[in-house]
């Protein structure tokens, strides 16, 4: 049976295989992440920092395990851009993976909503919910899908937070995926990335939610708009928020890639040269 399926279903086009692998990896990651966020909200643990750290780390770990050997399972458009800038993947693959990441995240948002539809209705946050009820933005519910800052946080503080978190994430990701560095074994790589995400999230998520991943924030935000949560999910703080967790991780990832390459990647002696995990064949 397995041989028959392998023969009949095998897809010759590498780009399609990578897209499907990355989309499924992202779907796994976001399903676990959003499902955990919903559980935290319904159980009154949305402000439990340790709970948030644990589901952030384990969600991305199992997402990487799904398609890591096929597409690389970077499952983060900002990190995907960073590794493309360093020449570790082609620009074509960068576009393929990024599209899969956004779409996989969007589909996961829809599935989690359907699974928790009855619970959302019971908590007054179902299909007829609007984010302003009455006239007060319900960040607690909208925050199931995407991140929102503390009310006191100024725009410049939010921008710096997102850039810095993404930069740290990129430092760590490039280091543990670099054969020339103290890279973990293949089977432990997803765990190392999960621990990295947990550490950065625990250190810097309090004021912004530390999305660090454009597809993690934008796709669920778009879904929450589509299901009727109101334009407030985008217009919050006079449209001065939604673009920060969407675009600033790209800036942080590019800075992180540049700094890592200048200070570490370009400084290996000739005898230490190797190949990156994400180098295209």
From Swiss-Prot:
The keyword Zinc-finger does not apply. A motif (NPA 1) lies at residues 76-78. It is found in: Cell membrane. GO terms for biological process: amine transport; polyol transmembrane transport; purine nucleobase transport; pyrimidine nucleobase transport. InterPro entries: Aquaporin-like (IPR023271), MIP (IPR000425), MIP/Aquaporin (IPR050363). A motif (NPA 2) lies at residues 213-215. It is a multi-pass membrane protein. Residues 72-84, 208-222 dip into the membrane without crossing it. Induction: Expressed in early embryonic state, adult active, and adult anhydrobiotic state. Transcript abundance is low but expression is slightly up-regulated in the inactive stage (during anhydrobiois). This is Aquaporin-9. Keywords: Cell membrane, Glycoprotein, Membrane, Repeat, Stress response, Transmembrane, Transmembrane helix, Transport. Belongs to the MIP/aquaporin (TC 1.A.8) family. Residues 1-17, 70-71, 85-90, 176-187, 263-281 are cytoplasmic. Glycans are attached at residues 117, 128. It catalyses: H2O(in) = H2O(out). The chain crosses the membrane at residues 18-36, 51-69, 91-115, 158-175, 188-204, 242-262. The gene is AQP9. Residues 37-50, 116-157, 205-207, 223-241 are extracellular. GO terms for cellular component: plasma membrane. It comes from the Eukaryota. GO terms for molecular function: glycerol channel activity; polyol transmembrane transporter activity; purine nucleobase transmembrane transporter activity; pyrimidine nucleobase transmembrane transporter activity; urea transmembrane transporter activity; water channel activity. Aquaglyceroporin that may modulate the water content and osmolytes during anhydrobiosis. Aquaporins contain two tandem repeats each containing three membrane-spanning domains and a pore-forming loop with the signature motif Asn-Pro-Ala (NPA).
């Amino acid at each position: 049976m397995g041989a028959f399926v392998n023969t009949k279903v095998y897809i010759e086009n590498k780009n399609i295989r990578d897209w499907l692998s990355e989309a499924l990896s992202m779907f796994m990651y976001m399903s676990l992440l959003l499902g955990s966020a919903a559980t935290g909200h319904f159980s009154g643990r949305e402000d439990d920092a340790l709970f948030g750290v644990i589901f952030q780390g384990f969600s991305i770990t199992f997402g990487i395990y799904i398609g890591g050997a096929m597409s690389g399972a970077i499952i983060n458009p900002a990190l995907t851009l960073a590794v493309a800038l360093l020449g570790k993947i082609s620009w074509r693959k960068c576009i393929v993976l990024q599209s899969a990441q956004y779409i996989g995240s969007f589909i996961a948002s829809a599935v989690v909503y359907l699974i928790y539809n009855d619970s959302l209705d019971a908590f007054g946050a179902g299909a007829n919910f609007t984010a302003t009820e009455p006239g007060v933005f319900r960040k607690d519910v909208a925050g199931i899908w995407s991140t929102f800052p503390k009310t006191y946080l100024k725009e410049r503080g939010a921008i710096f937070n997102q850039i810095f978190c993404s930069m740290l994430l990129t430092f760590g990701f490039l280091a543990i995926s670099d054969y020339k560095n103290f890279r973990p074994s293949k089977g432990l790589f997803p765990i190392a990335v999960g621990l990295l995400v947990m550490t950065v999230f625990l250190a810097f998520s309090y004021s912004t939610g530390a999305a660090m991943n454009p597809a993690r924030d934008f796709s669920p935000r778009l879904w929450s708009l589509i299901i009727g949560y109101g334009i407030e999910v985008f217009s919050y703080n006079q449209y001065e928020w939604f673009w920060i967790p969407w675009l600033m991780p790209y800036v942080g990832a590019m800075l992180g890639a540049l700094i890592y390459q200048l200070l570490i990647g370009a400084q290996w002696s000739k005898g230490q040269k190797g190949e990156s995990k994400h180098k295209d064949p």
